[in-house]
Amino acid sequence: MKPLVSIICITYNQAEYLSSCLDSIFSQQVDFQVELIIHDDASTDSTTEIISQYIKKCPFQIKTILQKENQYSKGIDIFSKYIYPKVEGKYIAICEGDDYWTDSRKLSIQIKMLEANQSFSATAHQSTVIYEKENREHLFCLLRKNIIKMDDVMGNRIFHTASFVFRSDIIPLLSIDIIPFAYDRFLFLVCSFYGDIYYFYDNMCVYRKSEIGITSHITYQIHKRDLFVPKKLKEINSNFPYYRYMAYVNKA
């Protein structure tokens, strides 16, 4: 039976945190089929060993993509090239290896909303941001509305990737030659082109800010990738306000 939801976990040198991430995924209480797709971008720590251990106890179908060379540093769109082709679910949830979900009902809550409302392209929710070295935390964003539109996501990150669940039929629109540094903003905007995003006030995940991770070593060349994003967005949606978006980016 095909899964209803494909959970994507991308990781790089996150052995210290990966167990918390995978445990939170495995703890989801659902009455539908789920698959887990793990992409490791050539970690040099014990991340791959931890993945091997969890494969043995995964309660649902699991697919692994274990790179021999780091793809992110080459600017390769790992989602379109490696991950999305393996997706079988109607919906996609993402949780990076150093983040984790805190509510076992998270997927059920979000999928129920999407199944009942075809006009929504995605759902998101509140998150907690934890600063590992500073021993402090805060809410990701004090958002006070449920219906999120393109203008809402154009200038600000109002929810975190670990809170996001979107329809997989949007995948063909997400292919981009060079993966942007701010891939989440690109993803949120494309989803907002094709329907509103429903936002839950419930706090159901943790975004861990640490020096370890996929974006821990950002160079000027990596930042330059985002210059390709506005043109791609304009290709997808001819009504996309290119110059207004660039004004937001230049202020950021």
Regions flagged by a language model, labelled:
Residues 105-138:
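Conserved donor NDP-sugar-binding/catalytic core segment of glycosyltransferases
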Residues 92:
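Short aromatic/hydrophobic "clamp" motif used to bind/position activated sugar donors
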Residues 85, 125, 141-221:
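Conserved nucleotide-sugar donor-binding catalytic segment
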Residues 19, 45-54:
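Acidic helix N-cap motif at the loop->helix transition within catalytic regions
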Residues 67-88, 109:
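Glycine-rich, basic loop-to-helix element that forms the pyrophosphate-binding segment
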Residues 23-33:
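Short, acidic, metal-binding catalytic loop of nucleotide-sugar glycosyltransferases
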Residues 40-49, 69, 96:
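A conserved acidic beta->alpha catalytic loop
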Residues 3-6, 35, 186:
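Cell-envelope/extracellular polymer assembly enzymes that use nucleotide-activated donors
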